[in-house]
Regions:
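Alpha-helical transmembrane segments of integral membrane proteins
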Residues: 3-10, 34-41, 68-82, 108-112, ...
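Membrane-interfacial entry segments at the cytosolic side of transmembrane helices
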Residues: 194-207
Length: 223
């Protein structure tokens, strides 16, 4: 039950961030009650449904082998992929608005894209075992083409970071954000190029960048 509670809270945080982004990007206001209703829906109702879905039925009651992979695939396909689609829709709508009005993106969009990429990488790792075992076409398509859909939005993030540099100068946090933006390009292009057949290089490359920017004697904090 604790696992389903955690999933419910993560989903609530994702939906709340999506609604808050609508307020920041399009000035669409949602009341505090709306966030409260979503919290109760995700942390109580949805968590309870997920917990009941985990209970074995029929002959599976006597099967002691775990079914965590099937549960995880269901969570990804029916909860987190639709949430990711929501993020993509909002960000592409904002990109279209920028092109029409010919204005620079706000700094908020960078953090929204960071959240989107975090979910994308989590989905890659969640789908990977099932992709190796079942080789489903839809899962392979998602693993390869989702990063391609995010690539144009990374350009939006880059423009937002450059604007922040020009308006407010260089800070340690903005240097980390710019480095993260460059790593996102590397991850998206890499996943597409190798058709997401291997993903172990993602945490390895992140660890290398972390060492170069934070752990070595010469790092961003010393600038």
């Amino acid at each position: 039950f604790a696992v389903t509670q955690i999933i419910g809270l993560i989903l609530w945080a994702g939906i709340s961030l999506l609604l808050f982004s609508l307020h920041q990007l399009f000035d669409i206001h949602f009341s505090g009650k709306c966030y409260a209703y979503i919290y109760y829906l995700c942390s109580i109702t949805l968590a309870l449904i997920l917990f009941l879905g985990l209970l074995p039925q029929g002959e599976d009651k006597h099967n002691r082998e775990p079914h965590s992979s099937e549960f995880l695939n269901g969570i990804i396909h029916y909860l987190f992929l639709p949430l990711t689609a929501g993020y993509l829709t909002v960000l592409y709508m904002y990109a279209a608005r920028i092109l029409v009005s010919w204005e620079l993106p706000t700094g908020w969009v960078s953090w929204l894209i960071v959240a989107l990429m975090t979910v994308c990488i989590a989905i890659q790792f969640g789908l990977y075992p099932a992709r190796l075992e079942n080789n489903k076409r839809f899962d392979n398509w998602i693993a390869r083409w989702m990063p391609v859909l995010i690539l144009p939005l990374l350009l939006l993030m880059t423009i937002g970071i450059v604007r922040r540099f020009n308006d407010y100068g260089i800070t340690v946090n903005r240097l980390y954000l710019a480095t993260l933006n460059g790593w996102f390009y590397f991850v998206c292009i890499g996943l597409f190029a190798i058709k997401a057949r291997r993903i172990n290089w993602i945490p390895i490359s992140f660890a290398i960048i972390f060492l170069l920017t934070s752990a070595l004697p010469v790092n961003y904090a010393g600038i």
